[in-house]
């Protein structure tokens, strides 16, 4: 699946935005439908950190999903992927990753969030719908960053 990217300039400085987006415990403050984060294991800083997100479904149920940071370059880029093997998500997804990139822009921060989702099997037929859904999710995430820092 192609990469979906959304960008926005946030009025907060890069170090503040970095502090928010690079700490998994902050995800409920800005990432859509995340009610809480558990089991954060920060192995040597941000890179290789692992955590469990409790996601709220539209029906109000909680769904657990495990993630790990695969790349971190302070204060420029934070990348995480969902651990899919052995989970119900594995039936539909081959890969799911998020990259947050930060650039200084006139005292504020240019935030780019990209999602890359590779669908598996018959789920690939829903690709256009998934692209729209991911775009909306990334817009909500940018709204969340703005709310959390302004």
Q: What feature does the model see in each segment?
A:
Residues 84-140:
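Beta-strand/loop substructures that line and gate deep hydrophobic ligand-binding cavities in soluble
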Residues 6-8, 64-71, 94-104:
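Hydrophobic/aromatic beta-strand elements that line small-molecule binding cavities or substrate pockets
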Residues 8, 53, 80-82, 100, ...:
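Preference for bulky hydrophobic residues occupying beta-strand positions
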Residues 1-47:
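Hydrophobic ligand-binding cavity/cleft-lining segments
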Residues 16-21, 27, 51, 69, ...:
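Hydrophobic pocket/interface hotspot
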């Amino acid at each position: 699946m192609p990469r979906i990217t959304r960008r926005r300039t946030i009025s907060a400085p890069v170090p503040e935005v970095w502090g928010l987006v690079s700490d998994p415990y902050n995800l409920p403050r800005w990432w859509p439908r995340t009610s809480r984060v558990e089991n954060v294991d920060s192995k040597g800083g941000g890179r290789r950190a692992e955590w469990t997100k409790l996601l709220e479904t539209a029906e109000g149920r909680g769904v657990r999903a495990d993630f790990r940071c695969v790349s971190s370059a302070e204060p420029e880029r934070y990348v995480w992927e969902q651990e899919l093997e052995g989970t119900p998500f594995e039936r539909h997804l081959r890969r799911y990753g998020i990259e947050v990139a930060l650039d200084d822009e006139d005292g504020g921060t240019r935030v780019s969030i990209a999602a890359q989702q590779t669908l598996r099997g018959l789920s690939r037929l829903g690709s256009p719908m998934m692209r729209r859904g991911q775009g909306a999710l990334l817009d909500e995430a940018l709204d969340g960053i703005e709310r959390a820092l302004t």
